Amino acid sequence: MWNVDVTCIGGIRSGEATLRPGPNIVQASNFQGKSSFLAAIQTAIGTTGLLTEDHPLMENEDDGKVTLETDEETYTVSLTRATDSDEPAISRSGTPYLTRDQDQIAARLFAVLGEDNPIRAAVREENQERLTELLKKPLETENIDLRIEALQREIKELEDEVAAAEAASADLPAAQQKVTRLQGELRDLNETRDELERKVDEETDQRALRDELTAKQSDLEREEARLERLENQVDRRKAQLDDKEAALESLDIPDSPTAEADIAEKQTRIDELAVKIDLLDDLHRSTKAIIDEGEIDLITDVERTLSGDTFSCFVCGAETTAEAVTERLNEISDRQESLREQRATLTEEVTQMQQRTREIESKRQQKAELEDEIKRLRVDIQEDQHEVRSIEATIEELQAEIEQREAEYEAAEKAGESHSAELKTIQQKIGSTETKLDRAQAELERIEAELQKRNDRQEQLETKRDELETLRQRRKQKYNELVNQFDAAMADIIGRFAPGFDGAYLDQKTDANDTVGFEINLARDGHTTDLDTLSEGERELVGIVTALAGYRTFSVGDRVPCILLDGIGQLAAEHIRHMIEYLENTAEILVTTAYPEAGSFDGETVSPEHWDVISHETAQSRDHPQITN
């Protein structure tokens, strides 16, 4: 049961009403506050001021308020007009029934079915593009499309990196062949040098000096090549260290959620609630069937009197009446709903805790990996730098020794024969070839490192593709469910209302860019037709069915237990009754409006008799139109 207290909302200066489970019909003539009362309920649940709409504060009033009292909680929402600007803006304060943006958007689109409902308006205006935008809105609040776009960009970047690595792999055979060729050339040069050295040894006594000088020169070239490779390696590792440290610094690990024991406890509570709900449901259904069918005398003795029938309670034996049993059944129904709400709340909490635990664990693992890699890189850099300093000292010593040996060799060379010049040339070629070989080996190592990087990026690419497919499947599942719910609801509506068309279908279309669109198509007399061929009432009927499909697809009933229906004056009185009967089992509380001439309806009648509303004349004197009907 809901109690609603309204002050300065729409056309209601003050008023209050009680809403009970089942249909609640606000029945009155124009300018008695019917639509304003529904706007007040909207304000309390938090669905006003969305989609570029204004809050329904009464014209020329600076403050308004709605208080919603449920069986468990009281919600108060205030509207305030800012008076310090040329175009006063209306702000909302307080805590509405719905606080999350995605819940408010879903309820505005699919539970608040007034004449200004955006879904009904899009169908009424035959705006299929706007209809698509609105039907996709709840998923936008989950950022699914944005997350898909971000993943697509990340996948494109990874694919480019993999392609670059693949291009590098194409150079691998040539690099391997170059290293093999240079190794062969170096072997040939060494053999030639050995032969020349033997000839020179036969003609001169320079062997000791030459060997020592050659060894020192070879040592120097090798050390210089080692130094170059080490310096390049230090630079690469420093760049990797900067990247890892930046990634570690940007990594945000949320606080740890409640322990696993809390999750297990909540799950146990959910299971217990499910058992209780089933037990109460069995008791309620069987007892209500006996009362509704008037078959109480099957299980107990009934005493029929002028003042009313009484009988012995078939459970405790006490004397009671059908009215008392019915009242007790209503209490059991209220208890059932309370247990369902508790179960839904606990289920959502468990889901959120489990998701948060997985996210935290993933980020912790990522942090540990980054910290290990940073530690390893720092140790490697320190070792490399120490080795660089050692090599630099060795190079300085070799350069000094070579300079000394060259002077000694040049002095002794004059006594040598013609083979000395050729030997020197070969020695220079050997040094040059060794340098080329070192560079070729370094290039080969770089290409092999690129191939390893490709493998790492390929693993990341597969992970991102799996994540993208998961999001696409969730989006596809919701879109398919939306189409199925529309088809099911439309089949029910056609059976109940017998409109002037054979069927309506919500078609889902996907373009080359993977963008999904929706379009309503109709069938009449075996042919496909458009919305513009429908009557005004038929078009409103299709709009309401579309909104109901969204209500069921996005589980709006689990977020707010009511549907508000207004602006259905285009429907005949019997069709309004059919609509109320159809919606009665969709939401716990149904609130709709009707004119007195529509006759009586089953359910709770809400009378604005004691409300203080602005009159028709007052409404016409306003600078802007006001909700008053």
From Swiss-Prot:
GO terms for molecular function: DNA exonuclease activity. It comes from the Archaea. One of its GO terms (biological process) is DNA repair. Gene3D superfamilies: P-loop containing nucleotide triphosphate hydrolases (3.40.50.300). This is Smc-like protein Sph1. Belongs to the Sph1/Sph2 family. Its main location: cytoplasm. It comes from Halobacterium salinarum (strain ATCC 700922 / JCM 11081 / NRC-1) (Halobacterium halobium). SUPFAM superfamilies: P-loop containing nucleoside triphosphate hydrolases, Tropomyosin. The lineage of its organism: Archaea, Methanobacteriati, Methanobacteriota, Stenosarchaea group, Halobacteria.
